[in-house]
């Protein structure tokens, strides 16, 4: 194996190969990380400077050590926030995604009530209302045009659901303005956008031109203006808040929360609902369309359950096959495809020394394809999550993270995914437009290089 040395010395990527790998990480990080793992193994160091260590790990045992066993030593850290290639820190601020230590503990304690069973179930009427609107729209559309751009529709619907359930169900939001600013901000933070910026800056520098990338700031300014207006209205009690904004207002009145805190949590919730859940639903619907036998089996599962328990609401039913499908979708296309941590103190992982201040990178995309745990890891196979097959793979599967900092909104996301996928399947048969497997991009979220389009046939 290239770069292999003493088993307890972390393989170091040769200096002459660093530029190639660095460009690869900016241009196509999923492919680049996979290639480096093939060459250097499950742990290796991309050392860009004398005192810097960017250590990639790709084994469940190492991941468990970082995210659970010694998680106190591995926080996001200032270095991770400041060097984030996606520039998320100015977007998400110090909200639940980016905070650390005692600050994170306090936020988690404040927000976890939003994800209790009671709180989650209280969002059902709004989920059903927005889903009903989408189904009605599609039912009319498919009469003349059966092709639907699923991703955009899911993004719009999830944004509506989030704003109504977590901000207010009384406001008439300017959904288009919020949607355009969010999509623009996310795209401007993509690795491809950053690569284009770096290339242009490098080209113009010899001409004495100091090129600065400002497009993301324009979108962020729009989002900040929207957030500021919403926060002002909340504090002045101009509308009845729901979910997140209700608990933030209560905390604000106790002088425990600032305007900035409310703004940051708003951005965190919008991002999570807007992109991660919507994208996960998109890929789930794609897999149903791409594998018609599985779609038929899931439909039969739904029909049988409804027939046996006609008085039980669909949100309270168990659908084992659908759950296998969703889990396999999240394995292949984990919305958050990488995690970064900073080692506060020096440590040892399976005998490998980890210097203090090292940046640790975990790619869930690569981990979910580790050949030791996922044979034929690029192939779609819902049997991967049958009880016997999944045994011992807890830390080989981390679409929501793992350990103490596992995504606080996991239960809500899974609840929304099941209800929405079930609702769509009851009304439409799904078919792919092309038999070719979609190519993917790792921006902030894993998406297709082209929009995911499906053919819908009304049942």
Question: Predicted segment positions?
Answer:
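N-terminal membrane-proximal hinge/A-helix region immediately C-terminal to the signal-anchor transmembrane segment
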Residues: 1-89, 102, 106, 121-122, ...
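Cytochrome P450 heme-thiolate monooxygenase catalytic core
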Residues: 1-10, 74-85, 103, 119-279, ...
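Cytochrome P450 proximal C-terminal region
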Residues: 2-6, 10, 37-38, 131, ...
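Cytochrome P450 I-helix active-site segment
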Residues: 7-20, 124-128, 179-185, 239-247, ...
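Short, conserved phosphate/pyrophosphate- and ester-handling motifs at nucleotide-, phospho-/glycolipid
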Residues: 59, 273, 357
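Cytochrome P450 heme-thiolate "Cys pocket" and heme-binding signature region
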Residues: 92-93, 267-268, 272, 309-310, ...
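Conserved cytochrome P450 K-helix/beta-meander segment immediately N-terminal to the heme-binding cysteine loop
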Residues: 362-389
């Amino acid at each position: 194996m290239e770069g292999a040395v003493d088993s307890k010395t972390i393989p170091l990527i040769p200096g002459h190969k660093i530029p190639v790998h660095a460009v690869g990480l900016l241009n196509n990080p999923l492919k680049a990380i996979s290639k480096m793992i093939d060459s250097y193994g499950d742990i290796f160091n991309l050392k860009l400077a004398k005192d810097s260590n960017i250590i990639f790990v790709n084994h469940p045992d190492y991941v468990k050590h970082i995210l659970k066993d010694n998680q106190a030593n591995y926080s996001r850290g200032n270095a991770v926030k400041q060097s984030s290639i996606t520039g998320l820190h100015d977007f998400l601020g110090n909200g639940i995604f980016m905070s650390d230590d005692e600050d994170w503990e306090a936020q988690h304690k404040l927000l976890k009530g939003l994800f209790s069973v009671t709180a989650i179930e209280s969002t059902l009427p709004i989920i059903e209302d927005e889903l009903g609107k989408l189904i009605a729209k599609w039912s009319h559309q498919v009469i003349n045009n059966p092709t639907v751009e699923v991703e955009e529709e899911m993004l719009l619907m999830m944004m509506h659901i989030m704003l109504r359930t977590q901000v207010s169900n009384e406001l008439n939001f300017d959904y288009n303005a919020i949607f355009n600013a969010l999509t623009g901000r996310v795209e401007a933070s993509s690795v491809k956008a950053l690569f284009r910026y770096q290339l242009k800056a490098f080209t113009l520098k010899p001409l004495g031109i100091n090129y600065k990338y400002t497009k993301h700031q324009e979108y962020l300014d729009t989002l900040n203006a929207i957030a500021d207006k919403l926060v002002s209205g909340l504090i002045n009690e101009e509308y009845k808040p729901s979910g997140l904004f209700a608990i933030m207002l209560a905390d604000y009145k106790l002088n425990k929360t600032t305007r900035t805190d409310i703004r940051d949590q708003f951005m965190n919730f919008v991002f999570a609902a807007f992109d991660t859940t919507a994208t996960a639903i998109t890929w789930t619907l794609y897999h149903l369309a791409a594998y018609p036998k599985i779609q038929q089996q899931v439909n039969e599962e739904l029909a049988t359950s409804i027939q046996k328990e006609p008085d039980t609401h669909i949100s309270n039913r168990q659908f084992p096959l659908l759950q296998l499908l969703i889990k396999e979708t999240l394995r292949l296309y984990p919305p958050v495809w990488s995690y970064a941590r900073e080692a506060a103190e020096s440590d040892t992982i399976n005998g490998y020394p980890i210097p203090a201040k090292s940046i640790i990178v975990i790619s869930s995309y690569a981990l979910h394809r580790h050949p030791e745990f996922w044979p034929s890891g690029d192939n779609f196979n819902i049997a991967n999550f049958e009880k016997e097959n999944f045994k011992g793979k807890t830390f080989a599967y981390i679409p929501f993270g793992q350990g103490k900092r596992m995504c606080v909104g996991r239960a809500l996301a899974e609840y929304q995914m099941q209800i929405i996928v079930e609702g769509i399947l009851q009304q439409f048969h799904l078919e792919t437009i092309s038999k070719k497997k979609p190519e993917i991009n790792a921006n902030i979220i894993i998406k297709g290089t082209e929009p995911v389009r499906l053919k819908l046939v009304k049942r």
